[in-house]
Structures are given as C-alpha cells and as structure tokens.
Curated annotation (Swiss-Prot):
One of its GO terms (molecular function) is structural constituent of eye lens. Crystallins are the dominant structural components of the vertebrate eye lens. It comes from the Eukaryota. It holds the Pfam family Crystall. This is Gamma-crystallin N-B. Belongs to the beta/gamma-crystallin family. Monomer. The keyword Repeat applies. InterPro entries: Beta/Gamma-Crystallin, Beta/gamma_crystallin, G_crystallin-like.
C-alpha cells in the first residue's frame, strides 16, 4: 500500500449500520458514487484521512485516523453531513514546521517538531498564526482551541503564506499535533 492510500468506510447509520461506502483514495463527491451525504459512523481501516462536510474537498475539515467512530460526535462534528474525503499525504516520519504570526512568513516565528497542546505555553505570544511552512515528511493538525479542540485544519509539506490557504476563516490557532497513526 502506498503512503497515500488506505481504506475508510462510511455508514449511513450509527454503529456501522445501513448502507456503506468504501473509499481507497481521493473521493471528491460521495453522491457521484451513489451515496448520500449523510454519514453517522465511520471505520478507518488503514491510513489517515481528511474528510470534508461538502463535496470537492470544501467546508469543515475532519481528521480521521485508524479506528472506529460509531457516531458523528466522535469526529467532533455537530451533524451527519459528509461530502468528500482524501488520504492525508504522508511522506515519512520526520516532523518539522514553522509558524508565523504574520502573513508571508513575517512576525514572531516558532519552530515545532512535536505536539503542542497550547502554543502560548511555549512562548508564542499570540493566538494568531497567519502563515506556516511545513518541512520534513509528516502532516500536522492545527486547532483553534487549546488541547487539540475546536475547528481543525490540516497542513502537509509545503508553504502556506496566509490562513486562507489551509481553508481557515480566521488565523486563530492555539494547539497543534502531528498525524502519526496512518498505517
């Protein structure tokens, strides 16, 4: 299996009941595969996935790692809408990123190589992260609230010169973790 693939199963009903949609790679629209956008449980058999509540990889993002999610609250959703998904692009296990207070890599900078439950406890003086550089091999999840809570955003290897590039509506980020459970 490539590091970009895996298997995820979406179920219409809670506790893995009802119709099932099995996905092995990018799926930009569940309805194109004959599956309505209502998902009440998910089983991630392999890989780590980013799921969106709208088709075409748009809307609220949910990060799902190997395991079982018997109801939508388990993946921090407030409803059963799900429209698209893709495997997270993992290249290996070397994690490194730089966070910047300002757009275009300006202002206060902080380097991370491991999980951080509260950025301000490590000396980042603001809760605004406006640009990010992800080096190394791994992917990261950034959260709007401390302790890996709230709205989440995925960043993979590359440069993000503004918060809109990771589909955030605002630059508020207070905790960050690595995605390590992807096989």
């Amino acid at each position: 299996m490539s590091q970009y693939s895996g298997k995820i199963c979406f179920y219409e009903g809670r506790c893995f009941t009802g119709r099932c949609l099995e996905v092995y790679g990018d799926c930009d629209n569940f309805q194109d595969r004959g599956f309505m956008n209502r998902v009440n449980s998910i089983r991630v058999e392999s890989g780590a996935w980013i799921c969106y509540d709208h088709p075409d990889f748009k809307g609220q993002q949910y990060i799902l790692e190997r395991g079982e999610y018997p109801e939508f609250q388990r993946w921090n959703s407030h409803n059963d809408h799900m429209g698209s998904c893709r495997p997270i692009r993992m290249h290996g296990e070397q994690y490194r990123m730089e966070l910047f207070e300002g757009c275009n890599y300006t202002g206060q900078c902080m380097e991370l190589c491991d999980d951080c439950p509260f950025l301000q406890s490590r000396g980042f003086n603001t809760n605004c992260v406006n640009s990010v550089r992800v080096f190394g091999d791994g992917a990261w999840v950034m959260y709007e609230e401390p302790n890996f809570r709230g709205r989440m955003y995925i960043v993979e290897r590359g440069n993000y010169c503004g918060h809109n590039e990771w589909q955030a509506q605002n630059p508020h980020i207070q905790s960050i973790r690595r995605i390590v459970n992807y096989f």
